[in-house]
Amino acid sequence: YDRIYGNVYQGIGLGCYSFGESRQIGNPVAFYLFQGARIARICPWLSFNYEWNFGLSGGWKPYDEQYNSYNKMVGSKINAYLNANFYLRWALSPRLSLTSGVTLTHFSNGNTNFPNAGVNTLGGKLGVEYNFYRKEDLTSLHAAASYHIPPFQRHVSYDFVFFGSWRRKGIWMQEGQYPLPESYPVFGFNFAPMYNVDYKLRLGVSLD
């Protein structure tokens, strides 16, 4: 499992943000799903990893012409939250690790309301991890290297996704751009036959 999928992990998380302008945009709180795994093992105690987060964020102060007219970024109280992390993990002991890397974050309402410039951040990541359930020690990694991985049976699988949302648009006039007063629904689907090449790679085409 560790050799095939890079010790993948999933869970739920809670994040709090402050941009130093709480009066204009608020102090958002994000609730999200996350998944991460090892991309490459540099040596027995050092690895390069990724983690993505996807969820919703609240606590925003949407644009109001009278109270926060400088807020040209956020038009909704609830916004989508997307985050990607790339980091190094140093194993200090079988259970304790030090992490350091970069993190990219995007907040947006998907054009469901205006304004929708969104908020994008780039930052550093520094943390300490403690694993309550890890029983292996670092030397067991060498023993795992001799474990035989079963050959992958290549096959075809199918992905089908149906989605729906709503959207608002603006129109250009001589005085400038003005938002339309109403939103409209958007629906769609995609169907993708996928050829499973190995344990971690699938290739295919999609009909949207």
Where are each of the predicted segments found?
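Residues that define the transmembrane beta-barrel architecture of outer-membrane proteins
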Residues: 6, 25-31, 76-82, 118-124, ...
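Repeated loop/turn-to-beta-strand initiation elements of outer-membrane beta-barrel proteins
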Residues: 90-98, 134-138, 199-203
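Transmembrane beta-strands of outer-membrane beta-barrel proteins
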Residues: 8-12, 48-54, 98-102, 124-126, ...
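Outer-membrane beta-barrel "beta-signal"
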Residues: 120-141
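Glycine- and aromatic-enriched membrane insertion/assembly motifs of diderm outer-membrane
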Residues: 1-22, 33, 42, 178-208
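Short glycine/proline- and aromatic-enriched beta-strand/turn motifs that initiate or cap beta-hairpins
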Residues: 1, 139-192
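Residues on the lipid-exposed face of transmembrane beta-strands in outer-membrane beta-barrel proteins
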Residues: 1, 33-39, 52-56, 82-90, ...
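Transmembrane beta-strands of outer-membrane beta-barrel pores
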Residues: 14-20, 54-62, 104-108, 132, ...
